[in-house]
UniProtKB/Swiss-Prot annotation:
Binds 1 NAD(+) per subunit. One of its GO terms (molecular function) is adenosylhomocysteinase activity. May play a key role in the regulation of the intracellular concentration of adenosylhomocysteine. GO terms for biological process: L-homocysteine biosynthetic process; one-carbon metabolic process; S-adenosylmethionine cycle. Pathway: Amino-acid biosynthesis; L-homocysteine biosynthesis; L-homocysteine from S-adenosyl-L-homocysteine: step 1/1. It catalyses: S-adenosyl-L-homocysteine + H2O = L-homocysteine + adenosine. The gene is ahcY. This is Adenosylhomocysteinase. It comes from Bacteroides thetaiotaomicron (strain ATCC 29148 / DSM 2079 / JCM 5827 / CCUG 10774 / NCTC 10582 / VPI-5482 / E50). Its cofactor is NAD(+). Keywords: Cytoplasm, Hydrolase, NAD, One-carbon metabolism. Belongs to the adenosylhomocysteinase family. InterPro entries: Adenosylhomocyst_ase-like_sf (IPR042172), Adenosylhomocysteinase-like (IPR000043), Ado_hCys_hydrolase_NAD-bd (IPR015878), NAD(P)-bd_dom_sf (IPR036291), S-Ado-L-homoCys_hydrolase_CS (IPR020082). Substrate binds at T65, D140, E201, K231, D235.
Length: 476
């Protein structure tokens, strides 16, 4: 059990999970998931003998779910040495973590970590035997990448760890990096020197990468997996279309039909959430800052309003933006009694959770894990799900296996690219022909039959018979 295990700075533990006896249960669900993840299984078949990842030390910071377990075992099957942690304190499925630990992979993750635990787990996953670091990273949200970069900066100027920060996760990150710096003053420079690159899973992490690149601070090459069509137009859209409702239902058992649902943001995630809630019979209001996305929402029949107008009308609120302060405390003050507030963006700063917790006279009653009822002094209350973190993973089990196979097939291909080729420091995307191949690998499973171009047809539109079929700038 986790509470009996040591937590020294650089641990020699083979793993740290909630309960290793859950491994058999986890293995049964992994076996089921494999049948729903044809892309990953095809990569095992294609590359299992050649092992293109032999010699790779892959660190993963990505939700430790059943689906991720299939990804991890694919990377291992292709020859990699793997260490793993979760990228969210609530998203780990403990039976999945146990099964992976039992298979011999070093995993440091359990559901309900605190933030000190979280960064400790990230550090352990970055620490390979012999004091080595990874040479490739699978990241989701950019926290592993950030730990290396902040640690690297601190080795140049320790004062960066004393700068005033307000977010608790940054406070805890700086605290553990101070301990690392005291013990090893060149660790992160050595790690960065051996890094061949990182592949980033989600919108938030990609924003961080581009920002570091623009500032000239990016230390190693990066693949933007999020913007592969077979990731963003499937995982973000179709995955959220199913997993949002799953999270809300498991947390609250609420009837969605007839309710007013406010979806903040109409990007790929917001589109999936809006259509999901409407399919249940809700009246959906959308908030947007982008005129193009706002027009798309309006043309789909959604009412586009401001949060100032929506906060008194909604029964359920969902943030999907990847930005900060989307639902503020002054919005929550005006909400209906027992309004449900949740987030499906990567971080917990879309909702002003800290301001809610420190609101004068507020009373918090925990209903069950990841469901808290906050009573305001005027008597009205709101239900906050997953403490403002990802509701689909905090209150349910995330996206279904099939759609995650798309994303994780992209991740595996990106890892092969980064490990086997030398890239200049920049942010890259997978080429179009690989995007199409990822889609192709999933067609047979759902009974799709492709039409094949004739040579004359291909020549007429200026493409190869076997693709790629669209220009890089094509919008799907």
């Amino acid at each position: 059990m986790i509470y009996n295990m040591s937590t020294e700075l650089f641990s020699t533990l083979p793993y740290k999970v909630a309960d290793i006896t859950l491994a058999d249960f986890g293995r049964k669900e992994i076996d089921l998931a494999e049948k729903e993840m044809p892309g990953l299984m095809a990569l095992r078949e294609k590359y299992g003998e050649s092992k293109p990842l032999k010699g790779a030390r892959i660190m993963g910071s990505l939700h430790m779910t059943i689906q991720t377990a299939v990804l991890i075992e694919t990377l291992v099957a292709l020859g990699a040495e793997v260490r793993w942690c979760s990228c969210n304190i609530y998203s780990t499925q403990d039976h999945a973590a146990a099964a992976i630990a039992a298979s011999g992979v070093a995993v440091f993750a359990w559901k309900g970590e605190n933030l000190a635990d979280y960064w400790w787990c990230t550090l352990q996953a970055l620490n390979f035997p012999g004091g080595k670091g990874p040479n490739v990273i699978v990241d989701d949200g950019g926290d592993a990448t950030m730990m290396i970069h902040v640690g690297y900066d601190a080795e140049n100027d320790a004062a960066v760890l004393d700068k005033e920060v307000h977010a608790e996760d940054e406070i805890e990150l700086n605290a553990i990096l101070k301990k690392v710096l005291a013990e090893d003053k060149t660790r992160w420079h050595r790690v960065a020197e051996e890094m061949r690159g990182v592949s980033e899973e989600t919108t938030t992490g990609v924003h961080r990468l581009y920002q570091m690149q623009e500032e000239g601070k990016l230390l190693f090459p990066a693949f933007n997996v999020n913007d592969s069509v077979t990731k963003s137009k499937f995982d973000n859209l179709y995955g959220c279309r199913e997993s949002l409702a799953d999270g809300i239902k498991r947390a609250t058992d609420v009837m969605i039909a007839g309710k007013v649902v406010v979806v903040c943001g109409y990007g790929d995630v917001g589109k999936g959430c809006s259509h999901s809630m409407r399919s249940y019979g809700a009246r959906v209001l959308v908030t947007e800052v982008d005129p193009i996305c706002a027009l798309q929402a309006a043309m789909e029949g959604f009412e586009v309003v401001t949060m100032e107008d929506a906060c008194t009308e909604g029964n359920i609120f969902v943030t999907t933006t990847g930005n900060i302060d989307i639902i503020r405390i002054d919005h929550m003050e005006k909400m209906k009694d027992q309004a449900i507030v949740c987030n499906i963006g990567h971080f917990d700063n879309e909702i002003q959770v800290d301001a809610l917790k420190h609101y004068s006279g507020i009373k918090c009653v925990n209903i069950k894990p990841q469901v808290d009822r906050y009573y305001f002094p005027d008597g009205h209350s709101i239900l906050l799900l997953a403490d403002g973190r990802l509701v689909n993973l905090g209150c349910a089990t995330g996206h279904p296996s099939f759609v995650m196979s798309n994303s994780f097939t992209n991740q595996t291909l990106a890892q092969i690219e980064l490990f086997n080729k030398k890239y200049e420091v920049n942010v890259y995307r997978l080429p179009k022909h690989l995007d199409e191949e990822v889609a192709r690998l999933h067609l047979e499973k759902i009974g799709v039959k492709l039409t094949k171009l004739t040579p004359e047809q291909a020549a007429y539109i200026g493409v190869s018979v076997d693709g790629p079929y669209k220009a890089e700038h094509y919008r799907y």
